[in-house]
């Protein structure tokens, strides 16, 4: 079995790569007319993680697109632990993922939203 720390690094790298590729594709659809603006953030509570947000606004096709990647760790609140596999005893977690939200300029085309996550608790 692959070491858990290695799997975390692989997941974090994969989500960074995925974020970059998604941003490139949205910019390609906009034919280079608009570019994403990058913002780096840190988790305020316990300072255990952070992420990168990319925002594209006022394109020809897209009114607004957000492509966010985060990697955080901490402890689930006690009332939430029983709902998460492997978190019941101590509540520790590590998570990484990508979230995408896109709103088109054309009001007849629906918005999209999706995310993908890798969550680690004390139970593998």
Describe each model-derived feature in a short phrase.
Residues 3-85:
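Gly/Pro-rich turn-and-neighbor structural signature
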Residues 67-124:
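Aromatic- and glycine-enriched beta-alpha-beta binding-site module
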